[in-house]
A protein has these predicted regions:
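Charged phosphate-binding loop/patch that engages nucleotide di/tri-phosphates or the phosphate backbone
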Residues: 128-151
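Conserved hydrophobic/aromatic beta-strand scaffold that supports enzyme active sites
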Residues: 14, 23, 86-88, 106
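Active-site-adjacent beta-strand/loop module that shapes the phosphate/pyrophosphate-binding cleft
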Residues: 73-95, 127, 133
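Short hydrophobic/aromatic beta-strand or adjacent loop that forms the aromatic wall/cage
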Residues: 8-12, 82-86, 123
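Conserved N-terminal beta-strand and adjoining loop/helix that marks the start
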Residues: 1-21, 37
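A short coil-to-beta-strand element that immediately follows conserved catalytic motifs
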Residues: 62-70
Length: 151
């Protein structure tokens, strides 16, 4: 029995600065709106190296001590698995600058719910970033409907 599966790994990083977090207004037509910086893990790259690289490319900041704090995962209609690695850190250096991915800025954490977020489920994603008893955000299909569990 072959237990291998096709998986795509991406990451997302919550960078905190006091009571503010770094947000990005993505310009991609596939996934527009406000979210945290991040991107794909490249072949041969460690997960930690990937999140450090992606944050640098998208924000100009060099992060350190990124802490893996959870995942979001789902299977598409062709049984291809997607895994988003959630990281958080308060350690960074450099000068903030926007990129082709979108504008970046520091936002008060309590204002996030009032912004045009990239996903409708962002408030539950934030729970996985912040609550120590949660580590997974798992999407699954029930008939034609997409549902999710926080674990």
């Amino acid at each position: 029995m072959n237990r291998r599966e096709l998986v795509e790994f991406v990451n997302m990083c919550m960078i905190k600065n006091g009571n503010r977090v770094l947000v990005q207004d993505r310009v991609s037509p596939d996934w527009p709106g406000i979210t945290f910086p991040g991107g794909h893990v490249e072949r041969g790259e460690s997960f930690t190296e990937a999140v450090i690289r992606e944050v640098k490319e998208e924000t100009g900041l060099t992060i350190s001590k990124p802490q893996l704090c959870g995942i979001k995962d789902w299977y598409d209609d062709e049984d291809y698995r997607y895994v988003v690695l959630f990281y958080k850190t308060e350690h960074f250096s450099g000068e903030l600058q926007s990129s082709d991915e979108g504008k970046v800025w520091w936002e008060d954490f309590e204002n996030l719910s009032h912004l045009k977020l990239a996903t409708d489920d962002m408030s539950d994603m934030l729970r996985v970033f912040l609550e120590e008893n949660l580590s997974e955000f798992f999407y699954y299909k029930d008939g034609d409907d997409w549902l999710y569990d926080l674990k």
